[in-house]
A protein has these predicted regions:
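N-terminal secretory/targeting leader peptides
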Residues: 2-19, 24-122, 132-365
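An N-terminal domain-start capping segment
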Residues: 127-131
Length: 365
């Protein structure tokens, strides 16, 4: 059975499972939706965000609109979740938009751009800077309505089997990265790889990979990457944030009562806050454990940061010149990014530096 016909075959249409009620009943309908998400079990925070979302929707609607995670709803191999949802495979699903950047390059702005925004800045652009409106306009052609639903925050720069001392060390480096980071690495002479989470540790161990960037300390610790690639570099300039998105099939969305739509929007915002805060709360302890287990932290050489920044700007400009849809989003995102970077240098970054001077960890070094 084709996935796009799943809901129709259930006799429900893309609006989801609306149970029949007598004509005299005017209350909100009873609706049940299956949810698709492919987060591996090791990613407990992202899976926890799914639970926050479904619980919140049920609570806000008095259990009349119920969303259940359905592990049998899986996109085809290499099919982005947003395409799966847009084609009718599920009424709702969670994923990372930059997985579909090969077909729609501007979707990188819905997840992460090298040297771009951090998690707070991403939320500011999405909710108050016009970003969410632009993403919804972009994804309307894909029959998807998107919502921010979580963010990993700043990530680590990657796990390497050997030290990286200069930009030339990136030449021929088989480096697992995601999204636009692959284009930047390619400009630096590296060989970007798309190895999935399940094969990461094995690929590093048997030298199929030289390095891998996954997420932050909490997730990386659970995957055990430090045990086979001990050199961990920072900052994570490739992904200063990584936003996850909730995708709702547009036809299913249009059939929802207004109060149910609002419940989804509120629940996604709650999950977005919960996931981001959870990562911030657990990453420090995970970083300590990583170093206690032998991880070797190293700052990226300034030469590499400068070369990567230059490559990023070149790639952004090239995409903007070649793609009108990318250019439209970029023209909003770039001035917002530049203004945020200036403000954060004056306020947030200077405060962080001064506050860290008084921290117990700093005073012992």
């Amino acid at each position: 059975m084709k996935r796009r016909n799943l809901l129709t075959a259930m006799g429900l249409g893309l609006g989801g499972a609306v149970l029949a009620t007598p004509a005299i009943a005017q209350g909100p309908p009873q609706i049940r939706w299956p949810l698709a998400a492919t987060f591996p079990r090791e990613l407990d925070i992202l899976n926890g965000g799914v639970e926050v979302l479904v619980r919140r929707v049920a609570r806000l609607t008095g259990n009349r609109f119920v969303i259940d995670r359905d592990s049998s709803l899986l996109p085809m191999t290499d099919q982005p979740m947003l395409d799966f949802v847009g084609s009718g495979g599920a009424p709702i699903g969670l994923g990372a938009s930059y997985q579909a950047m090969d077909r729609e390059p501007a979707l990188v702005f819905d997840t992460s751009v090298p040297f771009g925004l951090n998690a707070r800045q991403q939320n500011a652009w999405m909710y108050q800077g016009g970003g969410l409106m632009l993403m919804r306009e972009l994804l309307a052609d894909h029959d998807v309505v998107p919502f921010p639903v979580g963010n990993t925050g700043s990530q680590l720069g990657g796990w390497f089997r050997r030290e990286i001392r200069a930009a030339q060390d990136l030449n021929g480096l088989k480096f697992r990265v995601s999204g636009m980071a692959a284009d930047v690495l390619r400009r630096l002479g590296g060989q970007p790889q798309r190895t999935g989470h399940a094969g990461l540790r094995t690929a590093l161990e048997d030298k199929t990979l030289d390095a891998a960037a996954w997420a932050g300390p909490h997730d990386d610790l659970r995957l055990g990457l430090h045990k086979v690639a001990p050199y961990c570099y920072y900052p994570g300039f490739l992904e200063g944030n990584a936003q996850l998105s909730c995708y709702v099939n547009r036809h299913a969305w249009d059939r929802l009562p207004p109060e149910y739509r609002e419940a989804v929007e509120v629940a996604c915002a709650d999950a977005n806050l919960w996931v981001t805060a959870r990562y911030d709360a657990l990453n420090p302890a995970a970083l300590k454990q990583l170093t206690a287990e032998g991880a070797i932290l190293r700052p990226f050489p300034l030469e590499i940061l400068r070369a990567a920044h230059r490559a990023t700007e070149e790639q952004l400009e090239a995409l903007a010149s070649a793609n009108g849809r990318f250019r439209k989003v970029y023209s909003s995102w770039k001035p917002f990014r530049d203004a945020q970077h200036l403000w954060f240098r004056i306020a947030e970054n200077s405060f962080d530096r001064s506050a860290s001077l008084q921290s117990p960890e700093t005073s012992r070094n």
